[in-house]
Amino acid sequence: MSLQNIIETAFENRADITPTTVTPEVKEAVLETIRQLDSGKLRVAERLGVGEWKVNEWAKKAVLLSFRIQDNEVLNDGVNKYFDKVPTKFADWSEDEFKNAGFRAVPGAVARRGSFVAKNVVLMPSYVNIGAYVDEGAMVDTWATVGSCAQIGKNVHLSGGVGIGGVLEPLQAAPTIIEDNCFIGARSEIVEGVIVEEGSVISMGVFIGQSTKIFDRTTGEIYQGRVPAGSVVVSGSMPSKDGSHSLYCAVIVKRVDAQTRAKTSVNELLRGI
């Protein structure tokens, strides 16, 4: 039986699984899946093209099962003690393991085991949850959080206090995805499986969930659930039909191509909007 089949079958009977009742086969399958997520060999979601992703539901199910097969235990990072089911990613790492991994993790940075952090990533005091994938060259700035199973692309900058939503609590169908070369401004929140397509710039304090209307002021088009590639987005509002009030929305103020994005600073893109 394949790893996927074992996980799928076990998930159907998850209510009966506890640390004392789990079978050796299921436990090893779950732990092996977590190991593969941790190493980057397996991802919860795989990119097929711009804005197109395939979700490996069974990998997400393995993450959920991992909470059922383990008891809470005391965890120690050398400074503080914690009581949880999931150890941190590099709790037992040696200097050589850090060098081989090729990323920086400054004091205060936390990544849970089962998350993947690629080479040349910088983790400031931030949090990367289980199942997440942070690709090469990304910056996870201070107090930013990368939620469970979220996918962060190459050269993405998550500014201070940014929240990228997870999919486990509450359970969501698809992970939140930030594609390559995106900039997410300070204190912004992208949640509920929204996809920010490559090369987009999200200004400070923009909140986008599945129900958020994303208004393109150039074309008049309204998007939900995704930010089109190369968008520059700020927070705004849309009037109600009767004009009695306005509701929050995100506004695409301009589109930029990769060449313009490479030559232009983020501040310049957001000026004169």
From Swiss-Prot:
Residues that coordinate or bind substrate: 104, 141
Keyword NADP: no
Record carries keyword Oxidoreductase: no
Family matches, as Pfam families: Hexapep_2 (PF14602), THDPS_N_2 (PF14805)
InterPro entries: DapD_Trfase_Hexpep_rpt_fam, Hexapep, Hexapep_transf_CS, THP_succinylTrfase_dom1, THP_succinylTrfase_N_sf, Trimer_LpxA-like_sf
Catalytic reactions of this protein: (S)-2,3,4,5-tetrahydrodipicolinate + succinyl-CoA + H2O = (S)-2-succinylamino-6-oxoheptanedioate + CoA
SS bonds (residue pairs): none
Domain of life (superkingdom): Bacteria
GO cellular component, one term: cytoplasm
Enzyme Commission number, as recorded: 2.3.1.117
Subcellular localization(s) per the UniProt record: Cytoplasm
GO biological process terms held by the UniProt record: diaminopimelate biosynthetic process; lysine biosynthetic process; lysine biosynthetic process via diaminopimelate
Pathway per the UniProt entry: Amino-acid biosynthesis; L-lysine biosynthesis via DAP pathway; LL-2,6-diaminopimelate from (S)-tetrahydrodipicolinate (succinylase route): step 1/3
Gene3D superfamilies: Hexapeptide repeat proteins, Tetrahydrodipicolinate-N-succinyltransferase, N-terminal domain
Keyword terms of this UniProt record: Acyltransferase, Amino-acid biosynthesis, Cytoplasm, Diaminopimelate biosynthesis, Lysine biosynthesis, Repeat, Transferase
GO molecular-function terms, A-Z: 2,3,4,5-tetrahydropyridine-2,6-dicarboxylate N-succinyltransferase activity; nucleotidyltransferase activity
NCBIfam families: dapD, PRK11830.1
Family: Belongs to the transferase hexapeptide repeat family.
Subunit structure comment from the entry: Homotrimer.
Name under which the protein is recorded: 2,3,4,5-tetrahydropyridine-2,6-dicarboxylate N-succinyltransferase
Organism field: Neisseria meningitidis serogroup B (strain ATCC BAA-335 / MC58)
Gene: dapD
